Amino acid sequence: MNLGGCNDMSQISEYFRSIFFPNLGITLRNIGDHINIGSFEVRFYGIIIMIGFLLAYVLVTNEAKRTKQNPEMYLDFILILIIPAILGARLYYILFRLDQYIVQGDVGATIKAMLNIRGGGLAIYGGIIAGVITAVIFCKVRKVSFVLMADTATFGILIGQILGRFGNFFNREAFGAYTNSKMAMAIPLDYYRSDGNLDYLERTGVITQKMLDNVVNIDGMDCITVHPTFLYESLWNLMLLVFLFIYRKHKKFKGEFALIYVGGYGLGRFIVEGLRSDSLMIGDTGIKVSQALALVCFVIAVVLLVINYVRCAKRGWPAAVMGDAAGTEVKISGECDPADTEVETSGEADAAGTEVETSGGSDDAGEKKKDDKDATK
């Protein structure tokens, strides 16, 4: 094999770690998957996840301030969420890959393999499910609206997903089927040989026979060319986030942002998942778990959006989706109110549990004036 004049193993290793986009003329050299701090290895995937949580906090607290909620409440939630989200993502992945982790006759080795997340093996749907469960409990304890919190958290979830997919890039995973399209990404087979994973990836069908039949030689290295599905999904989520930023001043009802996210992400994931070669499957059915779940999410979200838009059209679109300066959302009779019938004060439940409603009818003050007038007659 010709490696372009490399004379030592470090140079050869750098070549193996190259990633190419040959049809775009892009070459990325020496793309590792970790850094060493002393004797400790830190995976880029983990670093990206932490950066994602930090940026999620920035976006979520910004949205909380805009909607007159308490931003500190979201900091509390994010700190609580980190461990359940990672555990949920890991358990979801393991559930559909049990054969990969179970070591017959050795419970200790099985548990160790399941807990070793440094080499990858996280599924976003598991993290979202764990996040929803955590949020429901959190909202019950804090006595705040789960739906309003879901709307606010949507911005953080999206930025986390946008960045998180680049962890797949560094790990050379979650890619799609063979392609020679303009966006084709080329990965040297020797990258997988170097860490002993090539045989496993071929055996499990992640690296397919079609990829091997269409190997291309770049700089003296045999490379598979695949769809960079991590990039497709990241760009799709970026478009969703930009749309929500543009649209957020026109919110029609509480829960709208969350439903737009669920439906939009479901549609994008359904399409992208169809291209992937490493999908988790439902037993031997040939059905991809994430694709099926994405379709269900898309359908449910669209149905709920249509129902709420029809309801809003019948009641009259709201004149404003925000409340007063104190952060109280006021229900105006006859309008489709984003707060439904709840009062949100700085993200905490109103101490009296009251609802504020204004309408064309008489209020308590009006009744009192009437009584006073009658008394003077």
Model-derived features with residue positions:
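A feature for loop-to-transmembrane-helix boundaries and adjacent hydrophobic helices
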Residues: 2-377
